[in-house]
Design a protein with these regions (language model features):
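Membrane-helix interface segments
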Residues: 30, 49-50, 133-136
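Membrane-interface helix-boundary motifs at transmembrane edges
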Residues: 46-55
Length: 296
């Protein structure tokens, strides 16, 4: 059946990711970071599958731990001193927790961008910004699709080189280096040619010209309007909560901020609902899909 949220209007998809990415980077409250990471994990697992999610986590979790370890080595602020390092600088609880928070934020943002690349395709991006910033939208759409396209082409080139006995993983060190350089040269040439061909193709079709019309398969339906209203409500509610201090949290000089007040709990729940919106939509769609045959 596929992901139900991906079939919504591109404006809904883009607004959702703009909100979750912005709040994931701005809100350093521990509860907000945990909620953002949870939502990103669930949605990435839904889009990519468990194996792909495990592969992403094998990269993200070491980054989280590295941030928690590196930050105390350079940041010695905080009033809760645990021990003194051989250099004489204190190791504080606040610096460790801030490193964990920064690592969690980084992991959540990376996972949200993984979901972004799966949902916001190049045609959606061009549809949203093609008339406003045609040149920049074309460059950004090409950039977004470059990495997965580059990986697929690299695998094709590696298999072709393997079939003719020039695999970069066999032979002496000098042979492996030469073959790796050859593959790299092939990929650079392919990337440049692909970019030029894409630009020439778009130019020949009149892309970016004033008054140019374009066919679009996207239509704003009632569900998209409801989704936009919901996302707008969540975004404004969280903005008001942040400005009112309901989501404030300080790591230095000591840990303090809003935690279990009813005023703050309402913001946590709204943020949780925002981050889980794609998952909830997909579960609801799956339930309707399962129930519909029984009613026939």
């Amino acid at each position: 059946m596929g992901d139900a949220f991906s079939r919504y209007h591109p404006l809904v998809n883009f607004l959702f990711f703009a909100l979750v990415l912005a709040y994931s980077m701005v809100l350093m409250h521990p509860v907000c970071l945990a909620v953002s990471l949870l939502g990103a994990l669930l949605y990435a697992g839904q889009l990519e599958g468990r194996r792909a999610l495990a592969r992403h986590l094998r990269v993200a979790l070491p980054v989280l731990l590295l941030a928690a370890l590196v930050n105390p080595a350079f940041n010695h602020a905080g009033v809760t001193i645990l021990i003194y390092l051989p250099s004489g600088n204190p190791l504080t609880l606040e610096s460790i927790l801030y490193g964990l928070a920064a690592g969690t934020m980084l992991c959540a943002v990376v996972l949200w961008f993984v979901c972004f690349n799966r949902v916001i395709t190049s045609d959606k991006f061009v549809y949203l910004f093609g008339r406003v910033i045609p040149a920049l939208s074309l460059v950004l759409s090409m950039t977004l699709r470059f990495v997965p396209l580059f990986r697929r082409q690299l695998e094709t080139v590696r298999q072709a080189q393997f079939c003719i006995g020039r695999d970069a993983s066999t032979g002496s060190a000098w042979q492996r280096a030469r073959r790796a350089v050859t593959i790299f040269s092939i990929m650079v040439t392919w990337a440049l040619e692909n970019a030029i061909e894409t630009a020439d193709s778009m130019k020949s079709r009149g892309y970016g010209l004033r008054g140019r019309t374009a066919f679009s398969i996207y239509r704003m339906e009632d569900r998209d309007k409801y989704a936009l209203g919901w996302l707008g409500f969540c975004g404004m509610y969280l903005l008001c909560g942040s400005l009112a201090g309901g989501l404030k949290w300080w790591y230095f000089p000591m840990l303090q901020g809003a935690m279990a007040q009813p005023f703050s709990i309402s913001f946590y729940l709204v943020y949780l609902a925002l981050c889980l919106t794609p998952v909830i939509i997909d579960r609801k769609e799956a339930r309707v899909w399962r129930c519909s045959p029984s009613k026939l």
